[in-house]
Curated annotation (Swiss-Prot):
Taxonomy, superkingdom: Eukaryota
GO biological process: translation
A GO term, aspect molecular function: structural constituent of ribosome
UniProt name for this protein: Large ribosomal subunit protein bL19c
InterPro entries from the UniProt entry: Ribosomal_bL19, Ribosomal_bL19_CS, Ribosomal_bL19_sf, Translation_prot_SH3-like_sf
Recorded GO CC terms: chloroplast; mitochondrial large ribosomal subunit
Keywords of this entry: Chloroplast, Plastid, Ribonucleoprotein, Ribosomal protein
Main location (coarse class): plastid
Gene that this polypeptide is encoded by: rpl19
Alphabetical list of Gene3D superfamilies matching this protein: 2.30.30.790
Family: Belongs to the bacterial ribosomal protein bL19 family.
Xref: PANTHER family: LARGE RIBOSOMAL SUBUNIT PROTEIN BL19M (PTHR15680:SF9), RIBOSOMAL PROTEIN L19 (PTHR15680)
Subcellular localization(s) per the UniProt record: Plastid, Chloroplast
Length: 122
């Protein structure tokens, strides 16, 4: 005999609230951020920092992700971070930008000074 457990969406939301990272700043698309990720190498742990521009954000409750882009040595590098991951140790907003799009995928085809975004002062 199989035991079937059905969870209502209300119950799922309550369970997810326990795992949501509460010290996360309100990050938006176009923000330049510095992210510290916990890296395990053998039996040692260290925090690796990376910096870049948020080109997209997918709001999905516990599974919220941000895509961060940076050009390193002439090569564009994008990485998707799970915002509520326990591996994320620090998330700092360095500057905010004034944008009119929800996804900044057009930055992939831009080079040099064309990738700059207008800064927003609050």
């Amino acid at each position: 005999m199989e035991l079937k457990v059905s969870l209502n969406p209300i119950h799922i939301k309550e369970l997810e609230q326990n795992y949501i990272n509460s010290n996360m700043p309100d990050v938006g698309v176009g923000d330049t951020v510095k992210i510290g990720v916990l890296i395990t190498e053998g039996n040692k742990e260290r925090v690796q920092f990376s910096e870049g521009v948020v080109i997209s954000k997918n709001n999905n409750g516990l599974n919220t992700t941000v895509t961060v882009r940076r050009v390193l040595q002439g090569i564009g590098v994008e990485r998707i971070y799970l915002v509520n991951s326990p591996k994320l140790k620090s998330f700092e907003i360095l500057r905010r930008s004034k944008i009119r799009r929800s996804k900044l995928y057009y930055l992939r085809s831009r080079v040099g000074k064309a990738t700059r975004l207008q800064q927003r002062f609050n």
